[in-house]
Amino acid sequence: MSAKVVLKDFLSQAPIDKLKATLSGHLPVSCITMDAKITSLQPGYHFLFFSLASPESNLNSDGYESLYSPKPNNPFSFKRRIWLHGVLRFHRPLHLFQTSECHELIQEESVKSPSITKEVEACLPKSSFLTKPTSEKQTKHVYIRRKIYDSQHQLCIEEDRTLAYLNRQELAIPKTLRSKSIPQHSWVFTPTPIMVFRYSALMFNAHMIHWNATYATKSENYPNLVLPGPLLVTSMLEYFRSVYPQMSKNMKRFEFRLLSPAFVNQPLRICISETGNLWIDRFTTDLDPPSLIARGRVYT
C-alpha cells in the first residue's frame, strides 16, 4: 500500500493558545509563558496543524483515520494500533500567519515472525485473560513521511513516524523498562482525561482509546484512557525548551521512541540528563525504579 496526500493549513495563533491552556497546570509555568512573542512554530507545534478532515464514514471502527491503516481489501485484520517511533527534522523556521502545505507519503510493510517484536510487545496492555491467538501471527508497520513547506515552498520540517498494527488477539504482559541515565532536571505531572481530550481535539484525532474509557478498557483491555503519542512528544519538547531555551532555538533533529503506553490519572515524570537525553517514566514513590514510557534525543 502506498498513498500520497497534500494537507494545507493556515498557521494561526489560536491552536497554540489552546495548547498552552491544555498544558497549563501540568507543565512548568515557564512552558506556558515563554512564547509571548513567537513568530514561528516551535518544535512539536506542527502536530496541531495538517490534520485529515475525513467524514466519520471514512474512519476505522476505533475512530482512527483509515488512510493510515492497512487497506480495507487487505486480509490483515488488526486488533490494535501502536505509535512506535519517529524523527523530527527542522530545516528553517515555519512562520505563523501563512498558508502552509504538508506532503505525506504513506507506505505499508508486513513484518512476519513467530512472535511480535519486543518493542511492540512492550506496548501491549496487561490483561487478566488470554484469548486464542489468530491463525496468522503478523505485524504490519505503516510508515508516514511528512514534508512541510512554507508559502514560498521552502522545506521547513520533515517528520517520519512509524505505526504498528497487530494481527493477534492474545495480550502480553509488558516487561519493565528502566532508564540507565540519571536525571539532571525532572518534572512530575499527572495527565487528566480533560487534558487528553483537549489535546486530541486540537489534533482532530478521534481515536477512541484517548476519549472513550469504555472502549479503551473493554475493547482494547487498557486500564484507562491512553495518552496520544504526540502529547508525550510535545511534553518532552516543551519541558526541554523551558530548561534549555537557547539550545532549543538551534534544534536540528529530535528522535523519539514510545516504549509503553501512558494512562490518565497516572503520575509521569519528564527527565533530562546532563548528556541531553530525555525520557518519560511512570513516577513512583516506591523503592523500585520507575519504568520507561518514552525516550528521546535532541540534536543541535
Swiss-Prot record:
InterPro entries, alphabetized: HotDog_dom_sf, Mitochondrial_HTD2
Top-level taxon in the UniProt lineage: Eukaryota
Gene3D superfamilies: Hotdog Thioesterase (3.10.129.10)
EC number(s) given by UniProt: 4.2.1.-
Swiss-Prot/TrEMBL keywords: Lyase, Mitochondrion, NAD, Oxidoreductase
GO terms assigned for molecular function: (3R)-hydroxyacyl-[acyl-carrier-protein] dehydratase activity; oxidoreductase activity
Compartment(s): Mitochondrion
Single biological process term from Gene Ontology: fatty acid biosynthetic process
GO CC terms, sorted: mitochondrion
Cited function: Mitochondrial 3-hydroxyacyl-thioester dehydratase involved in fatty acid biosynthesis. Required for respiratory growth and for normal mitochondrial morphology.
Family: Belongs to the HTD2 family.
Protein name, UniProt field: Hydroxyacyl-thioester dehydratase type 2, mitochondrial
Gene behind the chain: htd2
